[in-house]
């Protein structure tokens, strides 16, 4: 798919969300106009928009609920595959924060000057998802290639888990056989998990943390994917008009007793005392 068409599709996909965001923002502005003008100290209360990977949706919803309860601030979220979100940011020039499933998308965004400061959050690992009890006796990557196994995975050109899987297995010369054995490609990692949950697939590759909300599924780790991990980070969008509010949400998200605690509860790997230093876009680190 060529780049102009990809960007056009991303804009079309984002249009309903952007209209909702603008509507909500207008409503908030109208309410503020009826009251006294806010002081500079209230700038962090302005509503913000987060572009968030589908793999982080469950934990993000929990964190946002906590944030609204504590501060009463509005947070709009657009969920989707990481590449699609990046394309939407590039086309629309809107939003305040970008949280893809893998830090490599933030590197691409910084190269395009779409994000500035970036902050570490958590880590996920690629695993083989199966239905609880393992009815198909899937224990190895080779088992996923069997003729009686329906194997699905996320599109490597759209989703972080798909790109990570392809890159990892290509280095080992294993990608072609898995690609040929794939029954279907899905738009994002949660769609893969949903296929297993409803019984339309037997196995697939997902991030381990995604299965936190799928009690009927479990996962196995295989040596071929032992190095397939994704660092989850959040970046401030360069053209954000609400940087004070965006920074307040980042501080909440990355606090050990707030957002990071929720990430631990949802099965993500989070250091007990992670470094909270900002990786500036100009630092080159």
Stretches found by the model and what they are:
Residues 2-78, 83-93, 100-112, 119-124, ...:
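Exported/periplasmic ABC-transporter solute-binding proteins
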